[in-house]
């Protein structure tokens, strides 16, 4: 799936708020960089942390609630 399609799907998951999406992706990418496990299936070893975070949001595996709670 192309990045534009993933982004559109992620935006739908969080109510079409680009600010919230950027906040979620940035915080989750930071957590992934610090050793958190990816919540998506498949080989993520060659993916950027931001791409993994975006896919997690698009698949509904993570949202703003998890970021606010500090998960």
UniProtKB/Swiss-Prot annotation:
Pfam families: RNA_pol_Rpb6
Transcription among keywords: yes
Enzyme Commission code(s) on record: 2.7.7.6
GO cellular component, one term: DNA-directed RNA polymerase complex
GO term, biological process aspect, one: DNA-templated transcription
Cysteine pairings via disulfide bonds: none
Origin: domain of life: Bacteria
Membrane-spanning ranges: none
GO molecular function: DNA binding; DNA-directed RNA polymerase activity
Keyword Nucleus: no
EC supergroup of this enzyme: transferase
Role description: Promotes RNA polymerase assembly. Latches the N- and C-terminal regions of the beta' subunit thereby facilitating its interaction with the beta and alpha subunits.
HAMAP family in alphabetical order: RNApol_bact_RpoZ
Entry similarity comment: Belongs to the RNA polymerase subunit omega family.
Subunit structure: The RNAP catalytic core consists of 2 alpha, 1 beta, 1 beta' and 1 omega subunit. When a sigma factor is associated with the core the holoenzyme is formed, which can initiate transcription.
Protein name: DNA-directed RNA polymerase subunit omega
Taxonomic source organism: Campylobacter curvus (strain 525.92)
Organism ancestry: Bacteria, Pseudomonadati, Campylobacterota, Epsilonproteobacteria, Campylobacterales
Gene encoding the protein: rpoZ
